[in-house]
Regions:
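Hydrophobic alpha-helical transmembrane segments
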Residues: 11-15, 50-55, 88-89, 121-126, ...
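Small-polar-interrupted transmembrane alpha-helices in polytopic inner-membrane proteins
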Residues: 95, 119-136, 149-153
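Functionally important transmembrane alpha-helices
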Residues: 145-208
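Membrane-interface helix caps and helix-loop-helix hairpins in membrane proteins
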Residues: 73-81, 134-143
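Membrane-helix interface segments
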Residues: 45-47, 84-85, 117-122, 142, ...
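N-terminal, membrane-interfacial amphipathic/helix-forming hydrophobic leader that caps
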Residues: 1-35, 181-244
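Juxtamembrane helix-loop-helix connectors linking adjacent transmembrane helices
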Residues: 1-13, 35-104, 111-116
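Membrane-interface helix/loop boundary segments of multi-pass membrane proteins
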Residues: 101-126, 158-165
Length: 244
């Protein structure tokens, strides 16, 4: 079955991101002489931050889904017949690794490193562009999709700085991806999976809103939730700084 083979490859790819975490942490420790805490692995309230991040990640993506449904850009057709709890759990664990890996690389390493030498705003923009560039070879990438990926990078950076740890933003990123592909059955940055809780259909002619072949990350619904989310974060009190 081609779809099963595709899911197997996707799951293996997700777990392979553990290598990014390991290499990044080793580079920070051995080359930059940084403590692990400077990457954002702070102990205080670790589980609370992680669970909060999971909830926010699911919530903001669901907000984008609702925008698409309200505007007639997405139809949720009900429970997906191909759902498998075993495959779903593997995707969940895989995305927990993948989401954290991208956050460790882009926020924990790159943002902190750049911000030590330049203003924080420079670090935020630079790592957001790097994050978006990592997805340039994905299927269905468009100019709006790239802009949204930059916006996600900015949103994640502000969340990281405001919360002062990597746990929350890593969880947020992971569940954002899981919600797309394996809850709502929508392409994750152009990647399609066969195992999802719900079956959804992109409405033709509404690609500007729903993102078309790239998934919701390529449409204006995600643009709106990320801009609003970032503005809300900027208005909140900063919890603590990541340790220098």
């Amino acid at each position: 079955n081609a779809l099963v083979q595709t899911d197997t490859m996707t799951i293996l790819m997700l777990f392979s991101n553990a290598g990014i975490i390991l290499v990044t942490l080793l580079f920070c420790k051995l080359i930059q002489k940084r403590k692990v805490t400077t990457v954002g692995f702070q102990k205080p309230d670790m589980w609370k931050e992680y669970l909060t991040g999971m909830g926010i990640g699911f919530g903001i993506f669901t907000a984008a889904v609702l925008l698409c449904v309200i505007t007639g850009s997405l139809k949720i057709q009900g429970m997906a017949p191909s759902f498998s709890i075993g495959i779903f759990v593997l995707f969940l664990l895989g995305y927990l690794v993948q989401g954290m890996a991208e956050e460790v690389l882009c926020r924990g390493y790159f943002l902190v490193s750049v911000s030590r030498r330049y203003p924080l705003a420079v670090g935020i923009i630079a790592n957001a562009v790097l994050f978006a560039a990592l997805h340039l070879l994905n299927n269905g990438i468009t100019v709006l999709a790239f802009i949204n990926l930059v916006l996600f990078g900015v949103f994640a950076s502000v969340y990281f700085v405001k919360r002062g740890n990597i746990w929350g933003v890593g969880a947020l990123h992971s569940i954002w991806n899981l919600a797309q592909g394996n809850v709502y059955g929508i392409r994750v940055s152009g990647i399609q999976t066969s195992c999802s809780v719900l079956s959804s259909e992109m409405v033709a002619g509404r690609e500007l809103i729903n993102g078309g072949d790239f998934g919701l990350e390529g449409g204006l619904a995600v643009t709106i939730v990320l801009v609003v989310g970032t503005l809300v974060l900027l208005a909140t009190r900063q919890r603590r700084y990541v340790e220098d």
